[in-house]
C-alpha cells in the first residue's frame, strides 16, 4: 500500500467508530470515500442516501449511476478519480444536511481526507459541497462552471448534483445535463494539465454493485 492508502485506511478505521453527532443515530454506519488516492481530481457530494447507507459506498444509487455516465462521457471512470461527501452519515429521511451539520462533519473528516489526498482539482457536486468549499452566499446556478479557491487553496469548480438533474424534466433536464458535461470537461482539462501522465479513465465503467456487498442490518 502507498503512503496515502495507509493514511486513508487509518482514517477509515476511525470513521467507522465515529459517533460525534446526531446523524450517526439514523444510519447504519458512516460512508467514507471511493476511488484512487493518487487521482488529481476529487468529486465531493453532499451526503449518503439510502442506497449509499445500504452499501457503504458514496454515490452508488441513482445519482451515482448518472454520475458514472457523465464521467464516462468525458473519459473518466470512478476507479480513476475519488468520490466523497461533505457529511458521512445519511440524514434521516434523506434530507439535505444543513450548514451546521455540513460544517461540523467536514471539519472532522473531509478536511483530513483532503490533507492526505492533496488534490489538484475538486469538483463540488451541488450547493452543500459548494457552500462548504466556497461561500454560503454562492448560488449554484451562477457559480457552476466557474473556478474558485477553497480556504485551503484547492482549485474548485461547482456543478449540479446528479440528484438535481434527476428531478428535472424535459428541456430543463437536457440543459442541466449539458451544463454538467461542460463543467466536467473543464475539470478534466485542468486535471490533465496538472498531471498529464495520470490516466483518468479505465477501459470500462466500474460496476460498484459488484464491488460492494449490501450491509446487513
Tell where the protein language model's regions lie, with residue ranges:
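A polyanion-binding, active-site-adjacent surface
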Residues: 1-217
Amino acid at each position: 500500500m502507498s503512503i496515502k492508502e495507509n493514511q486513508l485506511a487509518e482514517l477509515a478505521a476511525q470513521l467507522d467508530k465515529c459517533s460525534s453527532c446526531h446523524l450517526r443515530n439514523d444510519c447504519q454506519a458512516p460512508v467514507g470515500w471511493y476511488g484512487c488516492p493518487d487521482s488529481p481530481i476529487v468529486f465531493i457530494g453532499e451526503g449518503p442516501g439510502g442506497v449509499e447507507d445500504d452499501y457503504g459506498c458514496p454515490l452508488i444509487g441513482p445519482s451515482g449511476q448518472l454520475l458514472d455516465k457523465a464521467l464516462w462521457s468525458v473519459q473518466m471512470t470512478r476507479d480513476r478519480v475519488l468520490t466523497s461527501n461533505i457529511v458521512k452519515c445519511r440524514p434521516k429521511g434523506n434530507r439535505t444536511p444543513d450548514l451546521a451539520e455540513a460544517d461540523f462533519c467536514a471539519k472532522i473528516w473531509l478536511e483530513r481526507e483532503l490533507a492526505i489526498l492533496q488534490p489538484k482539482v475538486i469538483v463540488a457536486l451541488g450547493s452543500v459541497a459548494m457552500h462548504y468549499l466556497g461561500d454560503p452566499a454562492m448560488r449554484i446556478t451562477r457559480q457552476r462552471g466557474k473556478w474558485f479557491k477553497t480556504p485551503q487553496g484547492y482549485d474548485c469548480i461547482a456543478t449540479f448534483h446528479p440528484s438535481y438533474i434527476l428531478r428535472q424534466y424535459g428541456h430543463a433536464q437536457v440543459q442541466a445535463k449539458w451544463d454538467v458535461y461542460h463543467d466536467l470537461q473543464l475539470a478534466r482539462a485542468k486535471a490533465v494539465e496538472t498531471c498529464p501522465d495520470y490516466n483518468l479513465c479505465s477501459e470500462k465503467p466500474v460496476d460498484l454493485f459488484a464491488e460492494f456487498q449490501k450491509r446487513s442490518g
